[in-house]
Amino acid sequence: MGRDIVKNLKFKKHAGKHFDPEKFAQLLDESYRNTKRADGEMTKKSFSPSTLGYGHGTCPRYWYMAFSGAMFIDDNDAVAVANMAQGTQAHERLQKLISTMPEWKAEEEEIVNEYPPIRGFIDLIMEYDAETVIGEIKTAKQEVWDQRQAEMKPTTNHLLQLLTYMKLKNAKEGFFLYENKNTQELIVIPVSMNEKNKAIIEEAFTWMCEVWDNFKEGDLPMRPAGASKSKMPCTYCPIKKECYAGLTGTVQIESYKVPKL
């Protein structure tokens, strides 16, 4: 069941004759959900750096079916849609500010790789001392932001996204700009393409090549061992319904093992 976007209507009845807050809340919820991408058949042509390393992005079967063409269903409720919209607005606001800096070179730059096929958009490209530096903007609720500040580390899936861009742009340095959704405070987390991070991203590329090669060979992977609709990596998978209604598969490929930072 989706979360209510308006929270205060269960405990107090409105006595007015004209304005109906419950109807208003329902329409607001519907308006948010109507901004989602419509459900439908879709064929992915490449890996998405923002999906790799979390949930269904670690599943070989998901990528095989996505590359083959599948019915994508967006189950996000109004609260999730609102959170994504807030994140988009924060990106645009911060990109506009950073674009005034002399070191700024580009924003939302498309990047494409042939093998393994990858397509993404880089939030920020800066230049310091003639060296390219890649920046990624993220927003986080209070408890997540507190953890990022305490550890001065990104989440693993965020790191994989940045390292992908750094590898493809041959950048030695990058950074995250995390904004607190509650207070708009910022933390900057620098990232270097050191030996540990090189190993992490090379392993990810090796896995993507294996998954892509298998897709080209036409062998449907089986679901990960112990998988169920209510457990990761299946929980929020947009093609879960078609996956579980489909064939068992003919080959077992290991899910991507998310590294520990």
Question: What residue ranges belong to the model's regions?
Answer:
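Short, small-residue-rich loop/turn micro-motifs
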Residues: 138-139, 180
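Metal-dependent nuclease catalytic cores that hydrolyze phosphodiester bonds in DNA/RNA
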Residues: 1-134, 140-147, 261
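Short, conserved glycine- and acidic-residue-centered signature motifs
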Residues: 154-158
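"Short basic amphipathic alpha-helical interaction patches in structured regions
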Residues: 147-153
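Metal-dependent nuclease catalytic regions and adjoining charged, substrate-binding loops involved
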Residues: 9-25, 152, 164, 168-261
